[in-house]
């Protein structure tokens, strides 16, 4: 039995490397089955047994980030409170929206200096990063007071007790509204009862007495009597004096001669035309003027 014991210890020494302690008792069962013989084993701590696997902190939770609908692997760890559920992390609030910490207790009472600094700091952060702010203050703006229209009469301005304001508005296009506005307008109220300018004589108003002017177109007179034109049957007589226009000429006369005032009565004499079947029309102008080839 004594020889078998050293042989067994020699076999164990070959199995374990030198300098590696052997686990005895219940610690031998704590060794992992997948550990290789060459891996050194850690010495048990005096507090108790230590697990070979790294312990996971209870205050840390792995967060999976998503980008454009696809999961992106990330190793960032965020701290969550132990009272919260790690499976449902809450949204992280920015510093600008965090409430300042409550003032601490001192021997003389609450320390309000830190709270004041926190409020000032938070106000500055909100001023720099306004974001979406909601104000609890409601501002009410009253509509402007409606001024009374100057086109309404004093009787219409007085509002009856039982009449609403909507019925008081009058249509500006109605006849009554226009007449009421014209009655209040000072312009046009003066009346002129005197004679008109053409009714005032020269002695009173100093204006000239307008008499009927003689007409520029005087009738032809002979021996002081006004001759009336009476058409006569038969052809007209040709005359060289008056301005004549022959309808049988092929070409338009280049020079038109105007008659003299003494030969006016020769226009009314009828003569035999030189062309036989053609007729010659003669007429005269009272005012002497030069005429062009086209009578303009």
UniProtKB/Swiss-Prot annotation:
This protein's name: POM121-like protein 12
Residues passing through the membrane, by range: none
Source species, domain of life: Eukaryota
Biased composition (Low complexity): 34-52
Region Disordered, residue ranges: 1-54, 142-162
Similarity comment text for this entry: Belongs to the POM121 family.
A Pfam family the protein falls into: POM121
Lineage of origin: Eukaryota, Metazoa, Chordata, Craniata, Vertebrata
């Amino acid at each position: 039995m004594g020889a078998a014991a050293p042989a067994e210890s020699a076999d164990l020494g070959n199995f374990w490397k030198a300098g590696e302690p052997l686990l005895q008792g219940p610690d031998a069962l704590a060794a992992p089955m997948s550990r290789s013989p060459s891996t050194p084993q850690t010495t048990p701590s005096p507090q108790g047994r230590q697990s070979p696997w790294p312990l996971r902190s209870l205050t840390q939770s792995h967060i999976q980030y998503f980008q454009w609908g696809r999961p992106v692997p990330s190793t960032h760890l965020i701290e969550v409170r132990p009272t919260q559920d790690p499976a449902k992390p809450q949204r992280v609030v920015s510093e600008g929206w965090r409430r300042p910490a409550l003032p601490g207790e001192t021997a003389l009472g609450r320390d309000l200096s830190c709270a004041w600094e926190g409020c000032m700091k938070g106000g500055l952060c909100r001023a720099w990063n306004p974001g979406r702010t909601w104000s609890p203050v409601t501002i009410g703006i009253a509509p402007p007071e409606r001024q009374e229209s100057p086109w309404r009469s004093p009787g219409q301005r007085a509002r009856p007790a039982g009449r609403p304001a909507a019925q008081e508005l009058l249509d500006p296009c109605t006849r009554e509204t226009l007449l009421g506005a014209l009655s209040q307008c000072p312009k046009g109220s003066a009346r002129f009862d005197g004679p008109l300018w053409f009714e005032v004589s020269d002695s009173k108003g100093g204006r000239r007495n307008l008499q009927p002017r003689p007409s520029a177109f005087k009738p032809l007179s002979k021996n002081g009597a006004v001759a009336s034109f009476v058409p006569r049957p038969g052809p007209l007589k040709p005359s060289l004096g008056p301005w004549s226009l022959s309808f049988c000429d092929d070409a338009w006369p280049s020079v038109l001669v105007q008659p003299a005032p003494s030969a006016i009565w020769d226009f009314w004499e009828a003569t035999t035309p030189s062309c036989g079947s053609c007729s010659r029309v003669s007429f005269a102008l009272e005012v002497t003027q030069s005429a062009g080839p086209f009578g303009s």
